[in-house]
């Protein structure tokens, strides 16, 4: 058989012409629906849960629903210019935010972009917003205090480094004020702070930033903002972004404090997203995983051991533990702590500070209810002198409230009951404290010492505030060395007790209040 070269070349040409290249774009899709910040995409075969999707105009969305023939994604920011038919691409990345010391003193949005007009941020790298919390073996028990500067909190509901302490109460009752004062009190302690504002008015946040700056605490603080006017996706992700920024310090053997203000609004934003994605609603129309929404966030607040820090820093930092302390805020409706989100967060956290409307309206600020407020782990971290002196404060207030209710119906009271009532009234008055005036350990110790040792008995009820102010001024000027020792060591012994007693005896003799 003779082969004809012409025939062979014609046959090859024919085969080449008939050959069809069938390619399938697995990482590019088309928007088929846009509504309320949610887009539905067809054609993204290789997308992963939580992956960032690139949209036209250098914007991004996050894939949350992976269905058989479409993907539900939530847009990070404005979505008005998106239209059906727009092409989108997968990125192979999850959402990351800038972290580092360059963020301290700055106001940023959920994505870590500066919104304070102070120019670009010099960050130390990027960190994913969703991080797995440290494991059991990597953690260390809480045994170092975080001083809030509030007598009522530091004496009765102490907070430790690495703890999660919920601040809960109705609106306009002083929840944010308590958290902001706790941040202000850290300006000289070395604890780095993160304040996350979720779903608040821009004017309110501007006021908070101004107050932090006035009191010299902004240089030590990162403010993460997702205002009420921003997309629900940004409000939902803001706490996770702030947490990653706080974890940067924890993982390098430092201490940090994060305030989530507030997680009720984050839960509402997540409910909005879930309902728009057509996920089945549960109790109060929240999705089934709203508990996990908060638990995976709050579990990241922890105290990690020196081995974890050494491993993370590749041996650069040795022998130092790190901590991230969380103060989540929850807003209740008419004091109802049995609602869905409040009960969830109460069960996740290591205690709660309950602020009560009736106490607030009666003039008690901070309006802490010591009866149902608790710190489950903070007792081990409490400063020695405060722990020793404040043992009777909580019981005195509890007995006072009980007797005060009873005494309304009883006409004649015995001397012991009357003495308990009078002591309780004075302790309640002593627990009052002005906003933006956090107290040092020594100042708190002197105030509590005066109550515990009976120095308030001879003071008129309406003069207790003046008595305390004059006493602290006297002690800081006449017994400066003692106050310095208490602040530096936090110890309490017979010598310190003797000096405190001598100082108070001398002050009471002066009658200068």
Curated annotation (Swiss-Prot):
It catalyses: ATP + H2O + 4 H(+)(in) = ADP + phosphate + 5 H(+)(out). Its EC number is 7.1.2.2. It is found in: Cell inner membrane. InterPro entries: ATP_synth_asu-like_sf (IPR023366), ATP_synth_asu_C (IPR000793), ATP_synth_asu_C_sf (IPR038376), ATP_synth_F1_a_nt-bd_dom (IPR033732), ATP_synth_F1_asu (IPR005294), ATPase_a/bsu_AS (IPR020003), ATPase_F1/V1/A1_a/bsu_N (IPR004100), ATPase_F1/V1/A1_a/bsu_N_sf (IPR036121). SUPFAM superfamilies: C-terminal domain of alpha and beta subunits of F1 ATP synthase, N-terminal domain of alpha and beta subunits of F1 ATP synthase, P-loop containing nucleoside triphosphate hydrolases. ATP binds at residues 169-176. GO terms for molecular function: ADP binding; ATP binding; proton-transporting ATP synthase activity, rotational mechanism. Keywords: ATP synthesis, ATP-binding, Cell inner membrane, Cell membrane, CF(1), Hydrogen ion transport, Ion transport, Membrane, Nucleotide-binding, Translocase, Transport. The record marks 373 as: Required for activity. Produces ATP from ADP in the presence of a proton gradient across the membrane. The alpha chain is a regulatory subunit. F-type ATPases have 2 components, CF(1) - the catalytic core - and CF(0) - the membrane proton channel. CF(1) has five subunits: alpha(3), beta(3), gamma(1), delta(1), epsilon(1). CF(0) has three main subunits: a(1), b(2) and c(9-12). The alpha and beta chains form an alternating ring which encloses part of the gamma chain. CF(1) is attached to CF(0) by a central stalk formed by the gamma and epsilon chains, while a peripheral stalk is formed by the delta and b chains. NCBIfam families: atpA, PRK13343.1. Belongs to the ATPase alpha/beta chains family. This is ATP synthase subunit alpha. It comes from Shewanella woodyi (strain ATCC 51908 / MS32). The lineage of its organism: Bacteria, Pseudomonadati, Pseudomonadota, Gammaproteobacteria, Alteromonadales. The gene is atpA.
């Amino acid at each position: 058989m003779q082969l004809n070269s012409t025939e062979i070349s014609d046959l090859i040409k024919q085969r080449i012409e008939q050959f069809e290249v069938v390619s399938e774009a697995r990482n590019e899709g088309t928007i088929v629906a846009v509504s309320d910040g949610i887009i539905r995409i067809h054609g993204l075969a290789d997308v992963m849960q939580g992956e960032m999707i690139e949209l036209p105009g250098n914007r991004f969305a996050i894939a949350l629903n992976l269905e058989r023939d479409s993907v539900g994604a939530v847009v990070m920011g404005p979505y008005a210019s998106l239209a059906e038919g727009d092409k989108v691409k997968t990125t192979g990345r999850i959402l990351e935010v800038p972290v580092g010391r360059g963020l301290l003193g700055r106001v940023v949005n959920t994505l870590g972009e500066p919104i304070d007009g102070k120019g670009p941020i010099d960050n130390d790298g990027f960190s994913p917003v969703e991080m797995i919390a440290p494991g059991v073996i990597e953690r260390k028990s809480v045994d170092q205090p975080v001083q809030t500067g509030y007598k009522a909190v530091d004496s009765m509901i102490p907070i430790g480094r690495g703890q999660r302490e919920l601040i809960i109460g109705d609106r306009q009752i002083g929840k944010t004020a308590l958290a902001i004062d706790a941040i202000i009190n850290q300006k000289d302690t070395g604890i780095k702070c993160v304040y996350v504002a979720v779903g608040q008015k821009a004017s309110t946040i501007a006021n908070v930033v101004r107050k932090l700056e006035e009191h010299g605490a902004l240089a030590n603080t990162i403010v993460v903002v997702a205002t009420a006017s921003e997309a629900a996706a940004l409000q939902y992700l803001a706490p996770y972004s702030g947490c990653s920024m706080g974890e940067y310090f924890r993982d390098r053997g430092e201490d940090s404090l994060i305030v989530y203000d507030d997680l009720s609004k984050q839960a509402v934003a997540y409910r909005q997203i879930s309902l728009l994605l057509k996920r089945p609603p549960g109790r109060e129309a929240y999705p089934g995983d709203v508990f996990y929404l908060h638990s995976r966030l709050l579990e990241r607040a922890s105290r990690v051991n020196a081995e974890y820090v050494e491993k993370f820093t590749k041996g650069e930092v040795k022998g130092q533990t790190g901590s991230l302390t969380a103060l989540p805020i929850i807003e209740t409706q008419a004091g109802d702590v049995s609602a869905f989100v409040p009960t969830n967060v109460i069960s996740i956290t290591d205690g709660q500070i309950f602020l009560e409307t009736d106490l607030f309206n009666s003039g008690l600020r901070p309006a802490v209810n010591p009866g149902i407020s608790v710190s489950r782990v903070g007792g081990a971290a409490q400063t020695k002198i405060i722990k020793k002196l404040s043992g009777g404060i909580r019981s005195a207030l509890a007995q006072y409230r009980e007797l005060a209710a009873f005494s309304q119906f009883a006409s004649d009271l015995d001397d012991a009951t009357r003495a308990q009532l009078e002591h309780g009234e004075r302790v309640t008055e002593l627990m009052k404290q002005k906003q933006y005036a956090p107290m040092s350990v020594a100042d708190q110790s002197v105030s509590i010492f005066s109550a515990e040792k009976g120095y308030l008995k001879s003071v008129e009820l309406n003069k207790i505030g003046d008595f305390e102010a004059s006493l602290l001024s006297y002690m800081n000027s006449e017994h400066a060395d003692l106050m310095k020792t208490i602040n530096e060591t936090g110890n309490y012994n017979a010598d310190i007790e003797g000096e405190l007693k001598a100082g108070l005896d001398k002050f009471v003799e002066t009658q200068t209040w």
